[in-house]
């Protein structure tokens, strides 16, 4: 899931998506597992202000509550600190770091997805 940082929080669109995904809590598959079980999720954040880690934690926490598995370091972000600034496409600063953490995120998501595919989480009880 991706979101810009707005006032140190996820965007209203990201929040609405999470609110709609909340309906997944009551849905189960044919084995009685929540439909988000055995699926992985990660977070991408952009913005020209501080608060990326807060946005990552809010979105990751919501996705985990819904049932997704969140691997360690399943996030990346790019920002240039507090206040207005250039757009990502207009600025090279910070891109290498964002790309590196993005590759780590992809590797971790793939590794956990493969592990869950080989050994899925079972229904409670």
Enumerate the predicted regions with their spans.
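Helix-loop-strand module that forms the ligand-binding subsite of alpha/beta enzymes
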Residues: 1-66
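Glycine-rich phosphate/pyrophosphate-binding loop and the adjoining helix
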Residues: 64-125
């Amino acid at each position: 899931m991706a979101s810009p940082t707005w006032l140190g929080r996820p965007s209203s669109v990201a929040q609405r998506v999470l609110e709609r995904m909340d309906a997944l809590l009551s849905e189960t598959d044919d084995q009685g597992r929540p439909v988000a079980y055995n699926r992985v999720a990660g977070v991408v954040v952009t913005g020209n202000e501080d608060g990326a880690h807060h946005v990552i934690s809010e979105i990751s926490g919501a996705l985990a509550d819904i049932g997704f598995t969140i691997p360690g370091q399943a996030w990346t972000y790019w920002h240039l600190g507090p206040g207005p600034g250039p757009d990502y496409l207009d600025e090279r600063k910070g891109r290498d770091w964002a790309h590196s953490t993005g590759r780590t995120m992809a590797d971790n998501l793939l590794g956990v997805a493969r592990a869950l595919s080989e050994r899925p989480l079972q229904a409670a009880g």
